[in-house]
Curated annotation (Swiss-Prot):
Domain of life: Viruses
Function: Converts 5-O-serinylthymidine (O-SerT) into 5-aminoethoxy-2'-deoxymethyluridine (5-NeOmdU) as a step in the pathway leading to thymidine hypermodifications in the viral genome. As a final result of the pathway of hypermodification, 5-NeOmdU substitutes for about 40% of the thymidines in the viral DNA. These modifications probably prevent degradation of viral genome by the host restriction-modification antiviral defense system.
One GO biological process term: symbiont-mediated suppression of host innate immune response
InterPro entries (UniProt xref): TrpB-like_PALP_sf
Protein name as catalogued: O-seryl-dTMP PLP-dependent decarboxylase
Gene3D superfamilies with a match to the protein in the record: 3.40.50.1100
Gene: gp226
The family this protein is said to belong to: Belongs to the pyridoxal-phosphate-dependent aminodecarboxylase family.
A molecular-function term among this protein's GO annotations: carboxy-lyase activity
Lineage: Viruses, Duplodnaviria, Heunggongvirae, Uroviricota, Caudoviricetes
Source species: Salmonella phage ViI
Length: 424
């Protein structure tokens, strides 16, 4: 993949490909990257976009349970869990790299402008990706200021990677995102505008781009063990949910019976249903929506129902199972598996900004995402936690400390770097 590198010629850490029982120092190298470095002279992160992260059977000694985990937290270009914590990692990071590569192919610059909330890992991920490709990042923040923003770990990490910050008065996207677009229009027209949530708005982008974006993540389904019958996925932005459901159409699993989407943010069922239809048409995956819908907190949900008068009275049983098909869609086939959805956010079991720590063996589940899901599963569906179930880790909580050895060129700025831009 890359030419051999003399590890003495630079300070980053050369690593072997992931080998489960290969131990050096304090623990196994838990990353799929051969070299840990920001420097493109040493490694190209995009070379690893389609490399599979492993699936591992991990025991929980506290509960005597064993479950398979999809380790997307091993998509980690700057760390390897040497001390139990990871740097930037996960599915979202992979997608950000892909988006930047596509932008560069189209003639854009590696500079990046985006806006997000102070607690989002999007900020350090975006800044690191831009820096890896030789660019600079401007992060728009709302409801904070230069004197207080560094109290937030994700903002601090973004500053460590070299981001500058532009501040707006409101923390709402309706204020933050227009400022991002003004920055691009008036300061840096060739910069990449990274959308909130590291995604592509399917109402603005071509079906080809939407399909490519999700088929990238869908490729990670390929190495799910064939014996798996149940798949558990955190449902936040639902980009990963959509990618995994795309992957299940690309790489069908012979024994899969149930997919559990556990919603820890605002309900995104329409988002998933809309995107799957776009992807199915573009990628010739007509069976992509052929699954039984068990939307437990939305039992009357039918895709497209809100646009049809009296839909609930006119939809056939097949329509209820498969969702309303748009004109020109292929004939209904038997469902391949059941998709269950629980909405923990809207039903107030937990709110998106709440945090729930959860430790499964040596795995620290992300308290905003996977930690909530595992807590709910243990309380409501503990029978799922067995060797026929795979729990999809979208990513783990990132920390600066594990990346310091790979990034000796980085340091925390003495003052918050501020872009003073205000639009005309």
């Amino acid at each position: 993949m890359n030419e051999p590198i003399d590890p003495k010629s630079f300070p980053s850490q050369p690593l072997s490909p992931y080998i489960p029982m290969h131990h050096i120092g304090k623990g196994p190298y838990k990353t799929i990257f051969n070299v840990l470095s920001l420097n493109r002279d040493h490694i190209h992160w995009e070379d690893y976009l389609y490399k599979h992260t492993p699936c591992e059977l991990v025991a929980n000694p506290e509960t005597n349970q064993q479950v398979w985990f999809k380790r997307e937290d091993y998509f980690a270009p700057l760390s390897c869990y040497m001390n139990g914590k990871q740097g930037i990692n996960g599915s979202k990071l992979r997608q950000a790299i892909w988006l930047m590569v596509e932008h560069l192919k189209a003639g854009g610059s590696p500079d990046l402008i985006h806006g997000t909330v102070v607690g989002s890992p999007q900020s350090p991920m975006a800044t690191a990706v831009s820096r890896h490709f030789g660019g600079k990042t401007t992060t728009v923040l709302g409801a904070t200021k230069p004197t207080t923003c560094m109290n937030h770990d994700m903002v601090k990490m973004s500053a460590w990677f070299g981001s500058e910050f532009n501040f707006v008065g409101s923390g709402y996207n309706s204020t933050i995102q227009p400022r991002c677009k003004k920055l691009i229009e008036q300061q840096n027209p060739k910069a990449y505008y990274l959308e909130y949530g590291i995604t592509l708005d399917h109402t603005l982008h071509s079906p080809e781009r939407i399909a490519g974006f999700h088929m990238l993540g869908g490729e990670q389904v390929a190495n799910i063990p064939d014996h798996i019958t149940d798949l558990i996925i955190p449902a936040g932005s639902c980009n990963s949910c959509t990618s995994i459901l795309t992957g299940l159409a690309m790489h069908p699993k012979p024994n899969l019976k149930n997919v559990y989407l556990i919603g820890i943010g605002p309900n995104r069922l329409d988002f998933i249903e809309s995107r799957l239809r776009i992807i199915g048409k573009q990628a010739n995956l007509p069976h992509i929506t052929d699954f039984t819908r068990c939307y437990h907190d939305n039992p009357d949900y039918v895709y497209g129902k809100k646009d049809l008068q009296h839909a609930s009275k006119s939809v056939s049983l097949a329509g209820l199972l498969m969702g309303i098909r748009e004109k020109g869609e292929s004939e209904i086939t038997l469902p391949r598996f059941a998709v269950h959805h629980w909405d923990l956010h809207t039903t107030n079991w937990v709110r998106y900004n709440d945090l729930m720590d959860y430790q499964w063996g040596d795995i620290e589940l992300h308290p905003r995402y996977e930690g909530k899901v595992m807590t709910w599963i243990q309380q409501h569906k503990p029978e799922l936690l067995n060797e026929n179930t795979l729990f999809w880790i979208v990513g783990s909580k990132p920390y600066i400390e594990p990346m310091k050895a790979a990034c000796p060129e980085l340091s925390m700025p003495e003052q918050v770097p501020v872009n003073e831009f205000t639009p005309d």
